[in-house]
Structures are given as C-alpha cells and as structure tokens.
Amino acid sequence: TKSNIKMKYSDIVNLRAMRPAYNIQEEGLGEWKTFIANDQFNGILNNMIKAVRNNDADNHKSVWIAGTYGTGKSHAGAVLKHLFCDSIDDIREYVEEEYRKEKYAMLRNSLLNVRSEKRLFPVNLYGQQSIAHEEDLSLQMQREIKRALRKAGIEITVKTDFDSLVEHIDEQPAIWQTLIDSNTMLSSVAPDLKKLKQLLQNGDTEVLERVRTAQRTAGIDIRLQIQNMKDWIFEVQNALKQQGVYDELLIIWDEFTEIMTSSIGGRLLVLLQEIAETMMNPENNSYFLFISHPSALLTLKEEEREKTKGRYHYVAHNMEPVSAFKIMSKKFKIVNEELYEQRKQHFYALHHELLGIFSQSSTDPAETIDNIMNLYPLH
C-alpha cells in the first residue's frame, strides 16, 4: 500500500540507549530488560527462588554473586531486583517472553508462583558507602533503608527508633540539651530532657518527627548500636509486611569488594553476618544480595572463606559465550509489535536461505535462527 511505501524503519523499531557499565542506582526505564539470560544466570535465579520460597532451611539464605569486571554481574543483580521487587504485573510479560520455551517451563512457573505470594522491597547500597569505622555500618544501612522507604512514599516508625534515642539521651545529655535549646519546634513540646525521654518512651510519633527535623537542621546523625541495628531491620521488615504491599527487604550491595578489601572488611563482614544469620530464621524473609569481585574473599583465611561461602548462595558469575546475533538484537526496541512481526516474516520468507547459512554451524540452530530473525531490519 501507499502508506507502507512511505513507512520508515523507525515507525516499527528503535535503538535502545545502552551504557558500557550498568549502575543499579541509576537505571534507565526498562534498561534491565536488555539483559541476556543464560544458564548461569538461570542457576542464580533458581537459587533465589528457593531462598525466597522459604520452605527449606538449607536454601533459605542470602545470595552472593562474585564475578570479574565486565561479566555483567551488576546487570544480573538488577534483573534479580526487578524480578523480585517490581509488581508481578510489571514483570509477567518479560518472564513469559524470556522464558517462553518449554525447557524453561519449570523455572518460569516457579518464579511466577513465588512472586504471586511474595514481593521484596529493594534497598541499594554501593561500594564503601562512606563507612570508615565499624559504627558507620549501622548508620549507613539505616540511612539507605529509610531513604528507599521515603522515596517509595512509605512511612514506618518502629520501637527501636524510640529506644535508641532514649539510650542516646542518657549517653550524651549535653548534645540533646543543646538540641532542645536551639530548636523551638522541639522545646515547645519537650522543654527539658526528662520530658523528651518520657514522650519518646511512650512512643509519641509526633515528637519523634520533631526530633528528626531538629537533628536534620543541626546536622546530627545518631548511630544505632549494631544489636539495635539488627532489631531495627527486622522491626522494619515486619512493619512493612503489615502494610500489605511488600513482604520483606532485599538489601542489594553492589561493588561489595570495596567493603571487603577495606582495613575493617573482616570485622564488617562479621557484623553483616549476624544480620544474615537472623535473616535465615524461618519467620524472616529478608535477604542480602552482595555483588563483588571474586577477590573480595581473599582477605579471609581459607577456612573462613569456605565457611563464608557456605552461609550464602555463593555463585561465580563468569563471562559466558553469547551469540553476537542475540547481543545485537537486544539493541532493538520494538515500537509497533504487529507491524514489525509482519515485515520480519515477509523479509525472511524472501531470504530464507540466509537463516540456513548462518545457523548451520550452531550447536542450537533453532535458537540461532530465532536470534537472526530478531535482527530485522539489520541485513
């Protein structure tokens, strides 16, 4: 038809913008969907499904992905984040397309089944995360969890929020007296330390909010003790579950190598391990997802290294050979699905011999033909 003659390729297909390195904290919309799943990733996904399903103590543990630079481990981590944290309606199309083949039926069904029951809330941490001392760990984790909740419009206040402030008032009364004296919003409800402690012990959320505002204004951060930090995380997890949208937390720590290779890396891992072990209790459904270089564990003695691996679904993420055709086809973003499919089928009906030529040396000709056809309109 006349309209088809005037049709441009851009009417049916566009090129995706792709970056050389994947940043989980600064993703483009839908960028995660350009990931090419392979058997290695599917093994990691299967481990994660078994962990989140939480019906087998041996599998109910956090995940640690170790891969050298350029293997796509951060992108793999981002895909796991979306598959377990986005709403099931937002991932269904991707899952049913990526895992449409019969050989993936069990994986596809397992994932959708577990997602119909569970949804995790994502928290991103990256690299050293300004942690110079052990006490900074709880501060940074609490800050990032609160930031993620706030960004999602979720308000949660738990018992440890109040307890830790009361504890700090006892330890540092001078700081708190200065805070009251310099902030009328706070002093109007709590003119002295005794009154402030009493209101916090009674769980007064309005006073807590005024305290937080006063802290922000004065640039003061109260560090939680690590034991309090652990309690706080699981109180937040339980409060989140009660709200009915998310079940628990997925704390993703990319470039975790920086933590492990820091001068206090071994001690930080011990502290994180205490949290990870509590996560393994059957009543909990929160997880760490650590993403690191394999060298991250070289800071530990061999026996401790093997023990650490056993506490996680520890998986090596290597660079697997992926068909160049498949990589190239992921650059395309289909604008008009129906028209694209029509034009593609028409083109290959006319040039069917191309498919035979390029797939004859493949170990999986059917998949190679599929990948080549998805390269249309590149020819």
Question: Where are the predicted features?
Answer:
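Residues immediately C-terminal
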Residues: 71, 258-262, 296-297
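Substrate-gripping "pore-loop 1 plus following alpha2 helix"
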Residues: 264-274
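Conserved P-loop NTPase catalytic core
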Residues: 101, 109-122, 126-135, 139, ...
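Conserved P-loop NTPase "ATPase switch" module shared by AAA+ and STAND
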Residues: 244-265
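Walker A/P-loop-proximal flanking segment of P-loop NTPase domains
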Residues: 2-71, 77-78, 82-85, 97-101, ...
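Long, low-complexity, polar/charged, intrinsically disordered or flexibly structured peripheral segments
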Residues: 184-233
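P-loop NTPase motor core
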Residues: 32-35, 63-68, 77-192, 318-325
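Secondary-structure transition/capping motifs at alpha-helix termini
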Residues: 58, 87-91, 241-247, 275-286
